[in-house]
């Protein structure tokens, strides 16, 4: 049995800014539609870290975000929640993951657009540079927004228990090789 010095959980996954709109009337294609727009913070990894923090768990979030206004909002929120992002990867010139959706007047999604390319930066090399932090955690929780090779790295090189949130049916396929 390996004794771990940390009393924290490590979360590896995506942070997201969600921008959603809902039309007040039936949508008219190729036109400006009156409605309401809401912006919120999300991302499976960030949401897991957020909820663990609310439960009183000390959390280290390993993620990637850009150097844009969305990144500033994510960092401020994590600071307010006590989520440690000091080991997060900030990509100069990068765009923080953003999810944009539009709902029709009935609340059904008419369109969704996801820009999560920055999650590909959560590589085995990035994880290797944080291996001591990972191995001293009591538990590691990852999401499948990270590359499959990174999930494989966590399972192969990390000694704490690793739990994975599969995110979606399509992304759940990344988990099968490491079961």
Functional labels for PLM-detected ranges:
Residues 96-99:
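Short alpha-helix plus adjacent loop in nuclease-associated cores
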Residues 92-94:
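Short, glycine-/polar-rich solvent-exposed loops and beta-turns at beta-strand/coil boundaries
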Residues 65-68, 168:
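Residues in the short beta-alpha loop(s) of Rossmann-like NAD(P)-binding domains
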Residues 1-15, 60, 77-90, 101-179:
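Ribokinase/PfkB-type carbohydrate-kinase core domain
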Residues 1-62, 69-83:
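Glycine-rich phosphate/adenosyl-contacting loop at the front of the ribokinase-like
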